[in-house]
């Protein structure tokens, strides 16, 4: 087990999670363990802690599968395409992972094996995966809340602590990942030539700056004032009473209590399902409705490229088709 705080190279980590350990004990093949340690140590210089833990999690699952199904395999040179095909069936049917999750893990494993193959000069493991193996969610669409669901949810935010309510409104208006909202710093807001900008430090990737409206800037400024008064020694805006950052699980705990106590329902009559990333998807769909180009949407969402933007456009088109179905059916009958 590695405690990353004790290494000479400490990767970027998410302060709201506080996860610093890497556990290699489940990898029982000696060569597998030695090589993956070497690879992940090199990644500590360039990748965030969350990415490194994801790589270890994906490799650990594969190593456990190989130990259980093919215990005779001790070296990377002995891994075959047939074994990979067995693993594809296993991860898609026996693990309970969603298509997005197992596709992500397969892509991570593919990249790791390719890197290991180049490191050890083992050509065969660089080509064990086919491009089609890691394409399970090409047709998957992001999920978004309807306008009515957002209104019902926001009306109940007054039941939360005011600062937590501000956090959730700001989260919706920024369209950020929840860890990026919860780790906003007090110096995030700036002004230039009468326009406001916010600096967002993405825990997964990088730092970027984007414009915000006067209304949102005023809400952020109020949250900063409250934070400075209640916790003068912290650099962050959104803090618990004990001065610690909110974790996403703690946030969900408070919000879910609010949902059940106030009987907040979705459009199908079920309890409102609070998913922080769905607000980001909703924000992305709203941007497509504003007729923005893909590059502008990607910049506002903090994406490095435009690869995922078509998913938001497809979701918007499917929602529009559903909303107009009754009218179109009636017109077809005329």
What are these regions (language model features)?
Residues 118-122, 171-192, 295:
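Short, charged phosphate-coordinating catalytic segments
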